[in-house]
């Protein structure tokens, strides 16, 4: 019996009639609705899912379609009973797990909303409280945020010296490398005497004098730069002007250190050399001195009237040299003896620092080699232990003196050692030319490497299996 109430139909017939009609309608609706279509799944399992979904949909539909409370009350038990009976009548084979208890992947869209106790939600209940983790985002999670805050809120005064230091370091590096190249590559004559013989430095010296009468604090940044440029522009220096990059560095350093300069400016009457003899009271002085001497170690002649600072050399022995002494102006264009001596000493000493560096490098490489050899031994030991364990599990006896030619592990580990050895050989190859430069006398006594030239190629040829078997034996000599 179907009663119509404002176009909405409510099922009030007996249970036997309800079931087939409702199910049919539901199934039609289910098939047509794209949202409810279940993705590919085990057929039997799909039936179970379908039943559950249908039961719930039926319940919802009846509730929606019923207007009054009384009708709702009437319809609810009907649909529940129908759904329950249908769910029970589907044959459950042993292979089908009970869906409500299973931990299967959740694929159908509706179950999650309706079954609040669906296993995924019930077991991992803590997932629901995930938003609680959000507040921690704003909290301080270690030193990264600290650093950020410091950068944002910290005073600019703190930031500037840091940046200045960095720039200073870079500049120093650039200058050092430049000096290094010049001292090694240029003959002494080019460095010292030739530039000094030209009459042109007279004007340069005067300009420098005018500059030096002012205290460095008054000396503008561009003038520092200009001076370096003057020096660079001298035709006799026989060197291409260095790239503009260095110039940028210099201005940066000059500007950053301007406050420091004004703080410690010497008296106006003093010439630059007086400030210079106090070996870098402030880094900007250092910078200016380097700027004047950018083009190699040119020995300052008396024409510069001691305006240019003493020579800078990489090695500590050289930096201990006393500042250049004043000679009477009568000496004219001859280079001062101290300058020449210092230049010679520089040339003598620079290779010494190279040797020290190389020795340190060699020491490091030796340490690396020995440590990696130890690592290899340990690894081989581990491999053997594993093999032994496996052998014992299978009831076999395991001796380390086994047939290495046929032992897979031994062959592979030999390959490991081979690759490491190849690496060492290549490194050695790179080092040999340097060693020859250092000891040209011993060149004849260089021991020829026992390895063939092929071994050095960066991509070793793939060895055949028999070959690697052969090598396997003697590669493991140290075990």
UniProtKB/Swiss-Prot annotation:
<dbReference type="Pfam" id="PF15265">
    <property type="entry name" value="FAM196"/>
</dbReference>
<dbReference type="GO" id="GO:0014069">
    <property type="term" value="C:postsynaptic density"/>
</dbReference>
<feature type="coiled-coil region">
    <location>
        <begin position="353"/>
        <end position="379"/>
    </location>
</feature>
<keyword id="KW-0770">Synapse</keyword>
<comment type="similarity">
    <text>Belongs to the INSYN2 family.</text>
</comment>
<feature type="compositionally biased region" description="Polar residues">
    <location>
        <begin position="318"/>
        <end position="337"/>
    </location>
</feature>
<protein>
    <recommendedName>
        <fullName>Inhibitory synaptic factor 2A</fullName>
    </recommendedName>
</protein>
<dbReference type="GO" id="GO:0060080">
    <property type="term" value="P:inhibitory postsynaptic potential"/>
</dbReference>
<feature type="compositionally biased region" description="Basic and acidic residues">
    <location>
        <begin position="228"/>
        <end position="237"/>
    </location>
</feature>
<feature type="region of interest" description="Disordered">
    <location>
        <begin position="449"/>
        <end position="472"/>
    </location>
</feature>
<comment type="function">
    <text>Component of the protein machinery at the inhibitory synapses, probably acting as a scaffold. Inhibitory synapses dampen neuronal activity through postsynaptic hyperpolarization. This synaptic inhibition is fundamental for the functioning of the central nervous system, shaping and orchestrating the flow of information through neuronal networks to generate a precise neural code.</text>
</comment>
<feature type="compositionally biased region" description="Polar residues">
    <location>
        <begin position="449"/>
        <end position="461"/>
    </location>
</feature>
<keyword id="KW-0597">Phosphoprotein</keyword>
<feature type="region of interest" description="Disordered">
    <location>
        <begin position="315"/>
        <end position="338"/>
    </location>
</feature>
<feature type="modified residue" description="Phosphoserine">
    <location>
        <position position="177"/>
    </location>
</feature>
<dbReference type="InterPro" id="IPR029337">
    <property type="entry name" value="INSYN2"/>
</dbReference>
<feature type="region of interest" description="Disordered">
    <location>
        <begin position="226"/>
        <end position="247"/>
    </location>
</feature>
<comment type="subunit">
    <text>Interacts with GPHN.</text>
</comment>
<keyword id="KW-0175">Coiled coil</keyword>
């Amino acid at each position: 019996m179907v009663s119509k109430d404002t176009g909405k139909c409510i099922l009030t017939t007996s249970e036997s009639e309800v079931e087939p009609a409702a199910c049919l309608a539901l199934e039609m609706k289910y098939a047509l609705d794209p949202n409810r279509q279940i993705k590919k799944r085990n057929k039997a399992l799909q039936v179970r899912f379908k039943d559950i979904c249908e039961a719930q949909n039926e319940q919802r539909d009846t509730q929606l379609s019923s207007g009054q409370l009384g009708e709702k009350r009437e319809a609810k038990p009907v649909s529940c009973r129908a759904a329950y009976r249908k769910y029970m009548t589907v044959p459950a084979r042993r292979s089908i797990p009970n869906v409500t208890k299973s931990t299967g992947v959740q694929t159908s869209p509706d179950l999650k909303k309706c079954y609040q106790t669906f296993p995924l939600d019930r077991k991992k209940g803590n997932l629901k409280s995930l938003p609680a983790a959000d507040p921690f985002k704003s909290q301080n999670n270690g030193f990264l945020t600290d650093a950020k805050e410091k950068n944002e809120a910290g005073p600019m005064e703190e930031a500037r010296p840091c940046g200045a230091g960095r720039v200073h370091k870079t500049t120093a590096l650039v200058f050092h490398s430049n000096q290094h190249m010049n001292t090694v590559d240029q003959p002494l004559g080019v460095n010292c005497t030739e530039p000094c013989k030209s009459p042109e430095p007279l004007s340069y010296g005067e300009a420098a004098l005018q500059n030096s009468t002012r205290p460095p604090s008054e000396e503008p940044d561009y003038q520092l730069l200009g001076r370096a440029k003057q020096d660079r522009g001298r035709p006799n220096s026989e060197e291409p002007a260095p790239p503009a990059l260095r110039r940028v560095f210099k201005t940066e350093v000059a500007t950053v250190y301007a406050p420091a300069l004004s703080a410690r400016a010497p008296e106006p009457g003093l010439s630059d050399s007086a400030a210079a003899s106090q070996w870098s009271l402030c880094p900007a002085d250092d910078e200016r001195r380097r700027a004047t001497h950018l083009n190699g170690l040119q020995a300052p002649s008396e024409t510069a009237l001691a305006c240019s600072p003493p020579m800078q050399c990489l090695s500590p022995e050289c930096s201990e040299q006393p500042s250049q002494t004043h000679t009477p102006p009568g000496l004219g264009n001859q280079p001062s003896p101290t300058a020449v001596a210092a230049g010679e000493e520089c040339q003598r000493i620079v290779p010494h620092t190279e040797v020290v560096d190389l020795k340190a490098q060699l020491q490091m490489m030796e340490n690396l080699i020995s440590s990696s050899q130890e690592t290899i031994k340990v690894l081989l030991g581990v491999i053997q232990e594993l093999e032994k364990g496996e052998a014992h599990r299978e009831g076999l006896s395991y001796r380390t003196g086994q047939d290495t030619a046929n032992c897979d592990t031994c062959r592979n580990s030999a390959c490991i050692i081979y690759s490491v050895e190849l690496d060492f050989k290549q490194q050695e190859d790179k080092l040999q030319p340097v060693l020859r430069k250092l000891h040209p006398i011993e060149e004849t006594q260089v021991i020829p490497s026992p390895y063939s030239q092929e071994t050095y190629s960066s991509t070793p040829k793939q060895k055949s299996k028999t070959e690697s078997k052969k090598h396997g034996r003697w590669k493991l000599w140290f075990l």
